[in-house]
């Protein structure tokens, strides 16, 4: 079962693009990058999956390497000095977003908003090493979850 915010966002996005296609036709139809990223923030098994666009069923559609949420590319490692990692934001990040560092208990929760292109610094557990260029993934977009909760919450 999917979480309510996932169902609400996917259904709303589907409706939006069905309406757009019916209104403008194939030539006027294009998915906005921010809409795609929002969907991937909610649940993403990997950036390369095309879903049912190009095929129906088959082993290629299974996420064998990573069956859980893969998140979105969020920050690229610039350097590491001891436990402190310096990274550059690849997308806008929000307070309380969660970056995957290692296993679940080692994830990093941001304390403030970071704009795309800005540098951020955070501590990683002792013994963890990250090479320059390593991409940390956001596995929880708190601002998106909160906005969906506000929009669809039953009073």
What is each of the regions a protein language model found here?
Residues 1-155:
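Surface-exposed amphipathic alpha-helical tracts and adjacent flexible/coil segments at the periphery
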């Amino acid at each position: 079962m999917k979480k309510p915010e996932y169902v609400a966002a996917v259904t709303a996005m589907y409706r939006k693009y069905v309406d757009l296609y019916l209104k403008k036709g194939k030539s006027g139809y294009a998915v906005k990058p921010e809409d795609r990223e929002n969907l991937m923030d909610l649940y993403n098994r990997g950036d390369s999956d095309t879903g049912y666009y190009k095929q129906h069923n088959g082993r290629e559609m299974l996420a064998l390497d990573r069956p859980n949420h893969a998140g979105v590319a969020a920050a690229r490692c610039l350097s590491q000095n001891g436990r402190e990692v310096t990274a550059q934001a690849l997308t806008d990040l929000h307070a309380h977003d969660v970056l995957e560092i290692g296993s679940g208990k080692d994830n990093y929760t941001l304390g403030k908003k970071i704009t795309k292109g800005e540098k951020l610094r955070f501590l990683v557990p002792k013994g963890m090493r990250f090479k320059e260029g390593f991409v940390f993934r956001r596995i929880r977009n708190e601002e998106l979850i909160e906005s969906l909760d506000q929009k669809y919450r039953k009073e």
